[in-house]
Amino acid sequence: MSRVNAPGRLAIAMKIGLLAVTSSSAWTVQASTPPGASGQQRSVQAYTIGAGTLMDVLTRFASQAGVAISFDAAQLQGLQSPGLNGSFGVADGFARILGDSGLQAELQVSGTYRLRAAPSRGSVMELGTTTIDGQLLTATTEDSGSYTTGAVTIGKGEHTLRETPQSVTVITRKMLDDQNLNTIDQVMEKTPGITVYDSTMGGKYFYSRGFRMSGQYQYDGVPLDMGNSYVQADSFSSDMAYYDRVEVLRGAAGMMKGSGGTSGGVNFVRKRGQATPQTELSLSGGTWDNYRGQVDTGGPLNDAGTVRGRAVIAEQSRHYFYDDAQRKDQVYYGALDVDLTPDTTLGLGVAYEDVDASPCWGGLPRYRDGSDLKLSRSTCLDPSWNTWRSQRTTVFGDLRHQLNDDWAVKVAGVYTKNTQDIKYAFASGSVAPGSSTTNLLGSLYDYDQVDYGLDAYLDGKFDAFGQRHELIFGVNASRSDKDDFYSVALLPQKQDVFDPDRHIPEPDDSYFIENSTRGGPVKTVTEQHGVYSTLRLKLADPLTFVVGSRVSWYSSKSDSVFLTGGTEHARSTETGQVTPFTGVLLDLNEHLTAYASYSDIFTPQGNYRSQSGSALKPLMGESYELGIKGEWFEGRLNTAFNLFRTVQKDQAQTDYNSSCASSDGYCYENAGKVRAQGFEAEISGEVIERLQLLAGYTYTQTKTLDDIDASLNGGSFNSYVPRHVLRLWGDYALGGALERFSVGAGVNAQSDNFRVSPVSSEKITQAGYAVWNGRVGYRIDDTWSVALNGNNLFDKRYYTTIGTESFGNYYGEPRNFTATVKARF
């Protein structure tokens, strides 16, 4: 297909040029950018385009909308269009113009559109005399103005939420912006079905369906071993400034990477070079001196629009509600997308992030009996010399080639390097009755991690037995190199919890080494690779069967030298581990699809040895899901309800009646088996006109089925995961005389949760609570807007994380506000 660019600025010139071509020619309409135009999914604007040939109407619309569209003139020969009158977004406008022509405008990775035959699908809606295809939104969410998406990419290829037989939530760009979600921790706190738990190292642990999410991260679909270490917990210092969306899958995600946690996975999808010029400036200021500035700019870098760029710079400086802690973030991101041919696009990107912080970590202790000290929420028991420095560099690259209308191949790679230097101390030790002091435990960390990831897959559709099917076949590999030195030592000073001394003298680094209770250098290399395939068979018009499998090879070696004496060499290998996936979808009508699915995942445990000296089998996680999904209002609203059951078995457990040559002197056995089950309900998108909503309710019940300690059988596990969790946020754009205003409101609510102390066996409980948040936005004109966000509006006092008597109890944020000013050019 040849590509010709119409003369830039005048629609009449494009019209004359197009009408002059022969029917066999292929064309790209490259329109100029009208004032106020934005990215791939522009905001709604008014059009008055009279009836005429479809080529004429399509050309005029592309020009006025400021988008580029490629097509063969033969596709439009002899077709007419009634025109377009009214206010529409780009996708909606294309859909209405094309009507029942049998064609659709498909958004490409490059940000341009391509005209292709509309697939035969049962989920089309009849609106008057116009047939509109069910998918108006695309996978890209920025500038869509929506809390839902037209497609997800976490499972390879692009499929609607309704076509995906697993639970997936997408945190769109609008949601990120509306709630000022700037870190992965903040994103996960707002995601339905996810529970966030603070670690003593300042990171977060994420839980889904009763289990911890560990190491299941993707960058643009490329799997990495990010966030799976003590120094980071499950989170890491990545800023959300340069991401388009975050896709969160709940349930076993073995097809993503092979090994990992039972509970789910996360895919971060970055912003790309833009097809039309756009710049956004953002400044915000809030409670506790929380200031942030951001510049996001992009557009075509040549006249043809075949080279597109993007640059994002963000800087944030903030204090916290607890004493003296502060943090500064700097983010730099650049991206380039190049159309090597009309069907081949190369994407490149690089990000650099720097964190300079004086944190307050470790949380608060309790009385020895587990009761609350009732300290002020502003209390920090750490010394003022706590430091945390982190630098992260990430390089992205991908190449996508469209072989024809049905088949495409994509190759993508990611490299990331993270260095962290940490020195801190925190309160560690329960407070005795009649006393007010606790110990201080200090730590020194020098941490380096380099990750590589590569993924390549072929995705295509084919016809057989009178139906249309899809095949995905791919390979991927990842490697993680961790070089860590740490030392933990008890400080000689005590801390008074009711009158803390923040100016405790800072010990020299050598003190931590000379007085180390644990620590030393640790080097770990983890490699895994695999092949995977998914086949979507259309057995009948309403019935689709999905079957997939992955074969994985895994290797990990870790070498530790202990400052207290001795070494440890841990090895774990899995060869040809098969991970299956099956699913079935039944379209009940034009809106609803019922589905059932099974997936599993494995976690290697070969570094544990049994009494016979053999390596333990992998821990296995199995997920069963039965549900129904809905797609409404041309895909602008998605609903889902499911029943789930997850079983985790063969967990390594300590045999305290044995003796082995391990670091703790004990042997292990595959003995643990636990189960989590419950149901989820979720709604995302435009519920009524101008109201965007993301809401999810999750009920989770956990049970220990088999434990080496028989007294635990029948009880719950991970009891700090609440049984009931509600996440809700809505944003409503007012109409009439108040059309410049928008209002948002939401709540994070959960039932009680508890921990049984490993020290005293006391039950430490946090009662259920609800935290209400709100937002008011005002659009000054087409360029400027302002917003005021308020969090914890009723100033609820609660612990967001409960720990033990010794440490790990974290207060939730008190009431706070953030004002934001934005300009878009």
Each model region followed by its residue ranges:
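Gram-negative outer-membrane beta-barrel transporters
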Residues: D541-P542, E669-S757, F794, R824
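Outer-membrane beta-barrel translocator/receptor signature
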Residues: M226, Y242-D244, M255-G334, L340-T344, ...
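Acidic, small-polar-rich N-terminal luminal/periplasmic segments of exported/outer-membrane proteins
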Residues: Q64, A68-S70, Q77, G83-N85, ...
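C-terminal beta-signal and adjacent terminal beta-strands/loops
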Residues: N748-P758, G777-F825
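Face-selective signature of the C-terminal outer-membrane beta-barrel domain
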Residues: V395-N418, L441-D559
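Structural signature of Gram-negative outer-membrane beta-barrels, strongest in the C-terminal barrel
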Residues: D337-T341, Q449, R468-I472, N476-S480, ...
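Acidic/polar loop-and-plug regions of large Gram-negative outer-membrane beta-barrel proteins
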Residues: Q316-Y320, Y333-Q402, Y415-Q449, Q493-T524, ...
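Membrane-embedded beta-barrel scaffold of Gram-negative outer-membrane proteins
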Residues: D398-Y424, P618-E686, L693-T698, T702-D706
